[in-house]
Amino acid sequence: TGAWFVVDDVAEITEEKFRKHIHAMFKLTNGQLFVFSDIRRFGELRFIKQIADHKPLTLMAPEPFDEDACDYFLAQCKKQKYENKAIKEVIMDGQVISGCGNIYATESLFATKIRPTKKVKSISKAKKIELFKAIVDVLKESIENGGSTISDYRSVNGGAGSMQDRLKMYSRKVCPEC
C-alpha cells in the first residue's frame, strides 16, 4: 500500500492526506526527493541485500503474467492448506497469486461466475484455468487504466486511476446478474 512520489519539494504533493503520512524520504542524486506516504500503514520499507534475506519475498507467487504462473496457481490450489478454503481468500493470498487484492479478486470471480465463498476443491481444473485467465485480464485492464482510485491510491506519477469506473461487481451488495 502507500504511494511513492518524486518531487523537488514536499509541497508539490498536493493532497494534504499524503503529506501528513510521509514515512520515508530520500534525497536523490539529482536533488529531487523520493517520498513514501502510507495513509493506511500497511506498507513497509526494508533494506535487504538480496531477496533471499527476506523470507516473505521468497514465498511470493510468480507474477500472474509469467509463463509458468498458471501452472503454479493450479499446483497451489491442490495443496491441502488451500483446498477447503473459499476461492476468494485463496486468490488474494500472495503465495498463490501475486497482486490480486480484494478489488480484482471480486471482478475476476464475477467475470467467471464463481461464488467467492465456493471451496477451491469443488472448482474444476478448467474453471480454475478460466479464473486465472480472468485475473490476468482484469489486472491488465487495471494497469492500462492506471489502477483503481477508490480511497487513497495514486499512480507512481501521483495521478488517479480510472479502473474504478469500469468495475462491474466490486462494492456492490447484490450481484447485478443473479
Give, region by region, the residue ranges found by the protein language model.
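Basic, nucleic-acid-binding surfaces and adjacent catalytic neighborhoods in DNA/RNA-processing proteins
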Residues: I13, Q76-C178
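Phosphate/anion-contacting hairpin/loop surfaces
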Residues: T1-G99, Y104-A111
